[in-house]
Amino acid sequence: SEMCIRDSEGAARGHFAGNITRDGRVELAVGNYERNLNIQLWKNYSDVFRIRLQAPGGEEAELSTNIQGGKYTLELEQTRILVYLGEPLPYAVAQEIYLDMIPAEGSYINAGIWTIRLEPVVTVTGQYYLYLPAGSGIGESTGFYRATPQVTLTIPSTAAKVITVGAYDQVYDTYADFSGRGYADSTRTIGVAAAGLTKPDLVAPGVNIQAPDVYGSFTPVTGTSFATPIVSGAAALLMEWGIVRGNDPFLYGEKVKAYFRKGARPLRGETEYPNDRVGYGKLCVAESLLE
């Protein structure tokens, strides 16, 4: 198994998950000075939605989801919207509808509240997921109202045969809210049969970690990017114990993940394991070793 950062999107307001039978209206705040913004809508290919988009000034348009060529352009107020209609792929059963918003006039797209209305035409599951660009791709004021923190882990941490690492606050022994959330065994997401698949696998310290800087000193850093190297080092120690010292010559790959899961310890405030926040718990190499 390879080690993967889970990303720090848990509190970023960049994801909304809903069911069209009860969450057909989604509001998106667009901050000032956004030069462009893209929105991904993922849904079950069997579902057919009628989609309407309303600009901050009240002008609205219906998005055609059945058009030859799979792409077209429309304008709302001072914003040009490029619409791309995706299809299922050899490696994915879900459908993506991709909206790329750019200025039609001036340098910025319209700031304010954009509203996406989804109306069912043919409903099989009714599930849908909306995503904005991750990290620094958008301003701090841009995000969904009533955002969904679940399923905010990012590629490549979504792959099955990697060890996905989140972050926790080692001072308070609690989950770090910026750490992206995944899914547990009992959940299912569009295009992902998550039975038996848990993300993240575990968490490691990721708040105010002392790391070397370019000046030859140390500085406090925060993020899943600093939790993952801790688990990488722990994996190296585990494989040294198993392979180099002769305790287990086959201690690599998914077996390392299994040992980490077995040794993970509980965190304050988490009552059920595994879960979509901390997986099996916090890293503990000592508990992962066989007696």
Give the role of each language-model region.
Residues 3-5:
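Short, small-residue-biased leader/transition segments that mark boundaries at the very start
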Residues 24-45, 49-53, 105, 111-120, ...:
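Hydrophobic beta-strand segments within beta-rich accessory/binding domains
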Residues 34-37, 44-47, 158-161, 172-174, ...:
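Subtilisin-like serine protease catalytic core
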Residues 38-39, 47-50, 54-56, 206-273:
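Hydrolase catalytic cores
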Residues 47-81, 130-135:
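Extended low-complexity, serine/threonine- and proline-enriched intrinsically disordered segments
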Residues 57-65, 167-229, 287:
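Catalytic-core environment of secreted peptidases
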Residues 80-114, 121, 130-133:
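Beta-sandwich interaction modules
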Residues 122-167:
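C-terminal edge strands of extracellular/lumenal beta-sandwich accessory domains
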